[in-house]
Amino acid sequence: IEDLHHCLKHYGKRIVDRLMDWGILGEKTLLGHCIYINGHEMDLIKETNTMVVHNPESNMGNACGCPPTMELVHRGILTGLGTDGYTHDMTESYKVANVLHKHHLCDPNAAWGEVPQMLFDGNVKIAERYFPQKLGVLKEGAAADVIVVDYDPLTPMNGGNANSHILFGMTGKQVVTTVANGKVLMKDRELVSCL
């Protein structure tokens, strides 16, 4: 919050207003955290087609607050899920984001749809703004980024409950094989190649 106070004291403007003045906002700009933004700033982010990445574990670990991430998603702002280096396990970020917003909003139904949307749709759309390959699908011509997870579900798994299985049953420690851009990098937990 110190950066917001600094901007208000020295420039009489909020952070996103200053970014707008400098021409920084736009479809190739990715804002991190956005913890203390208000409705006006969200409007600017939306109008400029700027993207946001939510880093729940970093925000919690630094005790700097909970951003209005659910509102960003509901306003149609392209929002992804990240780690800010706090962890490298996106399933953990998925879990933390899910419970953080339930707790913050005092609503056990919050974040069920928004967090998987950020992880599986938002992250793909954000990456596609920077990389020419088709991402997020398994089809000819796409980047073919795939992980294989050693997971034995205790209950039947299908398309309707896969997100719940990922949320409650899987962790990054269960990844046994990784394929990036069609190239096997790790097989049976052994590194076999570099990018």
Give the ranges of each region predicted by the language model.
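Flexible loop residues that form catalytic
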Residues: 34-35, 102, 152, 183
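C-terminal cap of metal-dependent C-N hydrolases
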Residues: 143-192
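Active-site glycine- and acidic-residue-rich loops that bind
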Residues: 60-63, 129-131
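Short, charged, surface-exposed secondary-structure boundary motifs
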Residues: 62-66, 90-92, 158
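Short, acidic/turn-prone active-site loops that include or flank metal/cofactor-
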Residues: 56-61, 84-86
